Amino acid sequence: MPRGFLVKRSKKSTPVSYRIRGGEDGDRALLLLPGCGGARASPPAPGPGPVPGPLQPPPPTERAHAALAAALACAPGPPPPPPGLRAAHFGNPEAAHPAPLYSPTRPVSREHEKHKYFERSFNLGSPVSAESFPTPAALLVGGGGGGGGGGANGAGGGGTCSGDPLLFAPAELKMGTAFSAAAEAARGPGPGPPLPPAAALRPPGKRPSPPASAAAAAEPPAKVAKAPGSKKPKAIRKLHFEDEVTTSPVLGLKIKEGPVEAPRGRAGGAARPLGEFICQLCKEEYADPFALAQHKCSRIVRVEYRCPECAKVFSCPANLASHRRWHKPRPAPAAARACEPETPARAEAREATGGGGSDRDTPSPGGVSESGSEDGLYECHHCAKKFRRQAYLRKHLLAHHQALQAKGAPPPAPPAEDLLALYPGPDEKVPQEAAGDGEAAGVLGLSASAECHLCPVCGETFPSKGAQERHLRLLHAAQVFPCKYCPATFYSSPGLTRHINKCHPSENRQVILLQVPVRPAC
């Protein structure tokens, strides 16, 4: 906090008077200045040679008598008081205690001094520029009038008896401070003009800003505690992008980590041509871009996600999770409506929502939709009728089945080649109707009596899985779509397409990059 900050501003400061005691030890001889005809007893002025030490000011009593004699000799006035009486000087503290010559606030001329006097007299109420109770040390502050008391000029050094610069000098210009010492060192011993102080350059109505150290000391500790580093740092999440870069969950591919090898130079030290095609993973070189696009990199491997219940393979873990939801036990419905035959409308709705009965996988974008087969037609093996949609064919087959059941005639047998394709050979596993159903029901957590098996073609319900498969082999042999890459069979073309896209993508897909003919722009 700057000095003088807590000074009461209600009281207006008035010029301070100082009383100077006379000679207590006896009568002292008055010293007259040479300009007034008296003898000079002050120490000699410093010469051009080096000064051995700082000037020692005379005792206070001698300085008081010397200043009094100088004032009386230069200005006409009443006769001086006798030496026995105490001389009182009102408003002239500098006349009694002259300041040293190195004060930076010394005026240059009397006009400047008068102007400065009237200008500074309006600032008597400023708590910064004035002090309420000056100490004896403050009386030695360099002022404009005291500089000429013991100077080399015969007319009093060009100073005045004004105590303005003494009373209203800023605090940093006092004796013993670092600022005054620095100003004295900068001014030098020469008689050149003094450096202007900081207070003279400041507008009269402004209060000086405190230094940085004072501002830091005046700042409350709460603000210091709330530094910029006081905020809690947010938790930095460590994100690992390695899996996102090296794996493809849609295609089921992953890039293996290869050995770190230094780049090998070519034999002969020749530089590599610009037209060379090199795989960035396995570093194999190819002569043309087509061979580079068609090659199978050894670092790209297929990631398979196999279902533990039914051994189905998926390329994406999300598809496997969606598939495994079908293996969870369902709430068993009431026993009365458990094996109740479904109507054709309900069968259509179930087929539309769930897809094929034996293939409930997530449909792939590359599969063929159920709106039509690859040829766009579905043919009935009973009457050779053709339908554009599989749902229409199922309705038609259901009508055939109901008509045959009403007549009591046995259903027609499927062709011989279809029977050979349907029945497994001796090396293949034959599904057991009774034991297999029990094991499957035990694995899935379902009871055989509580679940009905629906025919995916005609919608007929059966109490067991074996009965459903026998029905499919005998009646709907033409509607079975076997996989040409594995012994799996499906009852719909979209189901077979989804199976091939998921389980056999490498055999089905071909590299078409850089092989598509460029079409002219429209």
UniProtKB/Swiss-Prot annotation:
UniProt-annotated stretches for the region Necessary for interaction with CCND1: 43-57
Matching PANTHER family: INSULINOMA-ASSOCIATED 1, INSULINOMA-ASSOCIATED PROTEIN 1
Disordered: annotated span: 1-112, 182-235, 325-373
Keywords for the protein's UniProt record, in alphabetical order: Cell cycle, Developmental protein, Differentiation, DNA-binding, Metal-binding, Neurogenesis, Nucleus, Repeat, Repressor, Transcription, Transcription regulation, Zinc, Zinc-finger
Keyword presence, Nucleus: yes
Location in the cell: Nucleus
Domains as described in the record: The C-terminal region is necessary for NEUROD1 promoter DNA-binding and transcriptional repressor activity.
Superkingdom: Eukaryota
Name of the protein in question: Insulinoma-associated protein 1
Family: Belongs to the INSM1 family.
Pro residues: compositionally biased ranges: 43-61
Annotated region (Required and sufficient for interaction with KDM1A), positions in chain: 2-7
Assembly notes: Interacts (via the N-terminal region) with CCND1 (via cyclin N-terminal domain); the interaction competes with the binding of CCND1 to CDK4 during cell cycle progression and increases its transcriptional repressor activity. Interacts with HDAC3; the interaction increases its transcriptional repressor activity. Interacts (via the SNAG domain) with HDAC1. Interacts (via the SNAG domain) with HDAC2. Interacts (via the SNAG domain) with KDM1A. Interacts (via the SNAG domain) with RCOR1. Interacts with SORBS1.
